[in-house]
Amino acid sequence: FQAKVIAGLAGYGEQKEVRNKIATICKEAFGNREFSLYSDVRIAITGALGGGDGIVVVAGTGSIALSSKNNHITRCGGWGYQLGDEGSAYWIAKRMLALYCQQFDGRLEKTQLYYLIKEKCKLENDYDIITFINKLNHDRTSIASLAKLNGIAAKDNDKYALQIYKEAAYEIAVLIKTLAKNFTSPFKVSYIGGVF
């Protein structure tokens, strides 16, 4: 009996250079063992839909939606944090941090969200937010992890936190509606990721 390695990897499959680099690393790591590589979202859609037709929306650090119809995969979104990822935890955190700055400036009233961010980021003065973000050095996972604060504020009916969630839900719904055009009969929708 010989095991086969099957891996679902973030970002695998879209760019040839990345695919080749990952394949080379896996050949070195697995030696003569047989292996197959797929994108993490391909594994997710297969698992979530049990190999059937439907749509899977993933909203974690980033966001993407995929539809599977007759074994054909179509994607929508998944453009990365610099170009899109609407509705993702990173996107939510970015909106939150912008609101923090607007609340400090006086453009918006200060709400619980403001105080949660100030406490979590250990800001002595409001301008320290710039240093805090710069120290994260564009680490999207660390920035995305701040989105939890939006959930805390939303549970207490913070109007800005609730608005961010409404906008995120709208963006995720647009991903689903775009892919729904591929179907003429009822279909399954599944969701995966920390935003949910």
Regions found by a protein language model. Give the residues of each.
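ATP-binding/phosphotransfer module of carbohydrate and carboxylate kinases, centering on a glycine-rich
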Residues: F1-K4, I25-K27, A48-I55, A98-F196
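Polybasic, low-complexity association/targeting segments
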Residues: V5-I6, G11-E14
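Solvent-exposed beta-strand sheet faces enriched in polar/charged residues
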Residues: G8, Y38, S190-I192
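Flexible, active-site-adjacent loop/turn segments at secondary-structure boundaries
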Residues: A10, I43, Y81, T131, ...
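Phosphate-binding/catalytic loop of phosphoryl-transfer enzymes
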Residues: G13-K110
